[in-house]
Amino acid sequence: MRLFAASVVMGCAVAQGLWAQDASSAKMAESVIKAWPAGVVTTENHPGEWAYEEGVLLDGMVAQWHATATGADFKYIKDAVDKYVTEDGTIKGYKADGHTLDDIEMGRAVLLVYRVTQQPKYYKAAKFLQEQLALQPRTASGGYWHKQIYPNQMWLDGAYMAEPFRAAYAATFQERGDFDDIAKQLLLMDAKMRDPKTGLLLHGWDESKQMPWADKTTGLSPEVWARAMGWYAMALVDVLEWFPKDHPTRADLVAALNRTATAAVAYQDKKTGLWWQVMDKGGKPGNYTEASASSMFVYALAKGVRMGYLPQSDEGVEIGRASCRERVCR
């Protein structure tokens, strides 16, 4: 529920910035505030914690705030961050020894609140997360392990969990050298995790080829998960927003986004306007069209067009609009 709410807010907020339509994202944002007024996302048997699910939800609220400039939306974001960031910049509940990229994601909201308020505690918290990434274990090729407990493995999820935060931090504090490694992480996934026949990206890559699920030749996992590829697509458009226009790898990232968009459009379900959970096995028993992943693709396609990374006439734009209007955002 938390991830679904976040992805719908983000998808609809960005889409409505591209097409004139009713403010579906505003309705979703209102429902989020009503459901979790204290700023901590809780569900049954889940009391709420510093985690990527809440971070992604706040990303959606940030997108909505950028579209409307409503003070209540920013207050909600700040209140949520303040539940975890103490006066000395410590992040309550953060498990540093886990080295999980998932726990970096909420740093984006911390950075946003710092840029608006300039309060030192938010800078300290963001700096701590940046320093955590400096300690992140890496594969032999230099890619981030997804977590300490997943050695030598890159997951597409990690692209979104870490790289947009890193890009925002690098741009905010003029750490230009960081953009080289940000591009390296994303382009390593593009090179190693994309199926050359379909253009789709596999969810995981074990460079050591030791995991039971890893192909003994490529190290890749067997399935193409829509949500995983959605994470990667969103990471690309969000990183490019911060990426220096004169950086030598910017064009490579735009090209990776175009490859991703082309593949996503090719495997979109023409009947529903959504994407199947296992993207290349549409209609198979047990498979289903997945709303969170569809919202992710809507977000990436719409923002990619709006920012000029994808062509205005791209078929994916119309597919994204139909999906958001008719199936997901209502």
What residue spans do the PLM features occupy?
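Carbohydrate-binding/catalytic loop surfaces
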Residues: 41-48, 59-62, 100-114, 144-158, ...
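Oxyanion-binding "anion nests"
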Residues: 231-282
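Long, well-ordered core segments of solenoidal/helical folds
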Residues: 22-41, 75-93, 124-143, 176-205, ...
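Bacterial N-terminal signal peptides
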Residues: 5-17
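Aromatic (Trp/Tyr) and acidic
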Residues: 55, 62-70, 110-116, 152-184, ...
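CBM-like carbohydrate-recognition segments
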Residues: 21-55, 64-107, 113-128, 286-299, ...
